[in-house]
C-alpha cells in the first residue's frame, strides 16, 4: 500500500511530513469554481473529495489518496465571501486591509480514498481566525516580500515577521491547509495508525498549544 498526497502545496507536504508516514506527491487537478448556492463547507469538502479521485489515477488498487482544500471565508452583508489567492500586490493589499482587526473563518475539507472504493471518507475543519490590528506599514512591508501572492486570503499564519493572527483558539494546522487531527481520525477509520504522535509533533513544530485536538480526535464537532 502506498500513500499518495494529491496536492502541490508545500505547506501540506510540510504538515504531512510531521506524521512520519511515507508518501508520494501526485497531482489532483480539479475545477475550483464554486457551484451556485454552494456553502463554504460544502465547497471545500467537494473539492477535497474530487482531488482524491483525480489523484487516484496515479496509483493502484489498495493505495490511499489524501487530499485537502482550504478556503478563507469572510462575510459581507450576511453572505459568505470566499477569499482566494490575490491576483497581484494591489489585491493582496486590499485583502489585508479588509481582514485587519476582524475575525474570519478558515474551512478545510480533507478526504482519504482507498483506490478501488467508490467514495472517500471525508470531513471538514473550521477555525475562527482573529486578525490583529497590524499597521499600514506592516502591510506594505509584508506585501513587498511577495509572500501573500500564493496564499488564500493573502496571508500565512506562520509567517515569522508579519504574524497576522492573535489569540487563536482553534486548529492552527487547518489555517495552514491540512488539519492533521481530522486526517488522523480518517486514516484510523481506514485502519491506518500513524507511526508517531501527530498531535505532539504538530504542536511542537508549530509552537502552538492546541486547545481542541482532543475533542477533534474524539469526533466532537466544534461548529454546527
Language-model regions: role of each:
Residues 14-18, 35, 57-58:
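Short loop/helix-cap segments at secondary-structure boundaries that form the rim of catalytic
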Residues 19-22, 60-62:
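Short glycine/proline-enriched coil/turn segments at helix->beta-strand junctions
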Residues 20-37, 120-123:
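Short glycine-rich, Thr/Ser-proximal phosphate-binding strand/loop in the N-terminal lobe
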Residues 3-4, 40-224:
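Anionic-ligand binding patches
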Residues 1-21:
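N-terminal beta1-alpha1 ligand-phosphate binding loop
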Residues 8, 28, 115:
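Cofactor-binding loop segments of dinucleotide-utilizing enzymes, especially the Rossmann-like FAD-
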